[in-house]
Amino acid sequence: MEKIRNSMKRNRTLLAALVAIRLLSFSSAQAESFDSASHFHQVKVVGDKVFLGTHEGLYELVSSNNMKKIGSVVFDVMGLAAIGNTVFASGHPSQGSSLPAPVGLIASGNLGKKWKQVSLAGKADFHLLEGAGKEIFGADSGSGNLMYSSNLGKSWQTIGKNKFSDIAVIPQMSGMAIAIQGKELVLTEDAFKSSKTIKTPTAFSQIEQTNSGLFALSGDSLYRSKDLGETWKKISPFKGSPGILSANNQIMLVTVGSDIFVSSNAGLTFKKVS
């Protein structure tokens, strides 16, 4: 899962780090600079590519200070999620766009080149969008509601007002997720119809689920849990307070101020890349 809701400066720091570890190897001749986008809402790793959800549409990072526009559809990408090779998005249409306002949920099976309407056209604007397997959680900015789909967004249930700043979907069991609510973690096994508080050694700011376990940031350290948050182990301390945690099953990235650290062994060791 990647969840980035920080300033433009921090997003650019994340992008620089991803380039440094050579996730991408494209020519910058076909790209636009970061200055062509007013601001970023989302940064997501999709396979071996890095996607940027911006005010001007969806872009792919192609070099340290360059990106290229994906597809011809321009919209303000507020929510972005990837499940396998399918990209899901939500947001607002640009002027002159044929998309509904708000967009609802749209999906692309060819990495953003073309989009199809999935559901909630003109009804939902998801700013938080997280998914795994066939499940998607979305926080609609208009109503303030947390919504849940068990069939890749085709139909939805309204859970209630959203109380969470981040959600990690656990794909091993339908309806299971762990979320950050204030200073607490909560676990659900029925898509937040009910939930229980997980006792943790500290308050977490961001949370990610990979094949190696559940990862979270707190204070100056990265923590890992191998039992769905019941117990935690501090695995990597940093000199300073980490700001961003982004991970897939191959790579994990943590920023500390202007420094970027990358791990290829599930957070056990990190290498400073800039």
What are these regions (language model features)?
Residues 8-11, 18, 26-274:
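Extracellular glycan-interacting surfaces
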